[in-house]
């Protein structure tokens, strides 16, 4: 079992927390992480690109001139692709770029990125993040007390709405729950700030 320091909201070290080696202490598999990041980035693409082919372009229903006798090349429509203002051949159409990888691969990628953050000492465990009301300034003071001044992913337990609302308006702060934190979120963050309850949930999901 790997141990990490456990802090309270004031930045004081209160104890330590044991992490499951099978989740937070494995050798990171970079190729699997790469595959999952590419998959998740592909799923974020809108895919709303579209062009008009010759059947969608307005006009062009009449043959521009007769078939024979003019000396010019035969033409059937002024919306053929070779005409200015004509349709596009084999242009992009709306589509989804998303694709799914096997669950085993996704789980291994999550374990890999969590393990990498722990190994790099970029995993900050906090006893809890409790707020009486949504207060951005209070959350900012928590980050300051924990010496977090770079891009951070805050991983909360389910239902901690006040903490989520307090953090969401801060620059360089991303909020997720233990079940929704993605490989892409973790890779993009310089540090992870994880509550003790969220750690238990992560271990329960990935064990």
Curated annotation (Swiss-Prot):
Q: Which domain of life is it from?
A: Bacteria
Q: Which cysteines are joined by disulfide bonds?
A: none
Q: Does the keyword Glycoprotein apply?
A: no
Protein's job: One of the primary rRNA binding proteins, this protein initially binds near the 5'-end of the 23S rRNA. It is important during the early stages of 50S assembly. It makes multiple contacts with different domains of the 23S rRNA in the assembled 50S subunit and ribosome. Forms part of the polypeptide exit tunnel.
Q: Which family does it belong to?
A: Belongs to the universal ribosomal protein uL4 family.
Assembly mode: Part of the 50S ribosomal subunit.
Name of this chain's protein: Large ribosomal subunit protein uL4
Source organism of the structure: Streptococcus agalactiae serotype V (strain ATCC BAA-611 / 2603 V/R)
